[in-house]
Amino acid sequence: MKSITFFVFNICSILALLSHCEDNDIYSFDIVNETNWLKIAKNIFKGKSPSNFTIIPFNNTGSSNDNESNKEESVLLIRKKIKSNKNHDSSIISGDTVNGDISDLNYTASNFSDNSEDIEDNQKYPTTSYNSFNHLNSNIAFNEESEYIEINSESDLENKIKDINIKSNLEENNTMNESGKVDSKYELTGDEKCGKSLKLGNISNQTNQETITQSLSVGEILCIDLEGNAGTGYLWVLLGIHKDEPIINPENFPTKLTKKSFFSEEISVTQPKKYKIDEHDSSKNVNREIESPEQKESDSKPKKPQMQLLGGPDRMRSVIKGHKPGKYYIVYSYYRPFSPTSGANTKIIYVTVQ
């Protein structure tokens, strides 16, 4: 009941804020899950006024509570009605608000799978689309989950889908790409034993970027431990691997949840995923000297929020393994997929494999 009360209080606060700008009848909020989606869909189709929709997933990355694994997946559906162009002075057509019984709502969702195959194609954010990474003149490719765009004809879709991965303003031959012919033996699970460990935290409220230099031996495992804040909507994402220093522009960051990892004959990197701290985990004590004082102060784990919205306090881990000597720029960012320019914290790991 506390979770329901907390959620209702937050929704009321949002509605109060919106009422200063526009008629509060413009917006409606619903939690959609497996039990009530049909009822909400019927109400939407019965409506007479055009609307825009924003879908925000509940937190499925920041919680390690095993008891949540059996609960339904839910999303927050934000509906904004559009005023009629025929009568600018008229109000929004009433009678089509999406209403649902509070008993049908499930306020805590189960965790997203760490496997990319379990991410549904319809988890898209209504923001700008992305163009493709530029390709290297090599047999390596970065296999990133395709960004959704609307194309009128199926033929256009077939021609363009190959070029739709992630928008980038990087220069040509700057981005590594993963080939479909790469042997799966180079793929990592993210559960490998750490040879070195680096913690990335010290999150700022303003957009920033930082470059950290690391060296690895061929075959050595580097674990990147990523810390976040609870319930802020921010997520850690692996954005790309580059051979030249990339130019970072948060406006070009993906607006869709991505879980695909990168692997090639040269270097393999996993997407960040949550992990439980093991007392016998060697990464807790190895190479602690590479942490900054600010990062060491953030060792204590933040409290978990009562309602787990997108973004969580639990640590995420990404694993890096170099297979051949070389120099690579590995780009991670802590940002909101539905608002990439709002305080994105980008960390670039400059790795020398020797």
Swiss-Prot record:
Localization in the cell: Secreted; Cytoplasmic vesicle, Secretory vesicle, Microneme; Cytoplasmic vesicle, Secretory vesicle; Host cytoplasm
Source superkingdom: Eukaryota
Signal sequence region: 1-21
Post-translational modification: During the liver stage, proteolytically cleaved.
Quaternary state and interactors: Oligomer; probably composed of 10 monomers.
Function of the molecule: Cysteine protease inhibitor. Required for the invasion of host erythrocytes by merozoites. In the mosquito vector, essential for the gliding motility of hemocoel sporozoites and, therefore, for salivary gland invasion and the subsequent transmission from the mosquito to the mammalian host. Required for the invasion of host hepatocytes. During the liver stage, may prevent host hepatocyte cell death likely by inhibiting host cysteine proteases.
Protein name per Swiss-Prot or TrEMBL: Falstatin
Species the sequence originates in: Plasmodium berghei (strain Anka)
Taxonomic path: Eukaryota, Sar, Alveolata, Apicomplexa, Aconoidasida
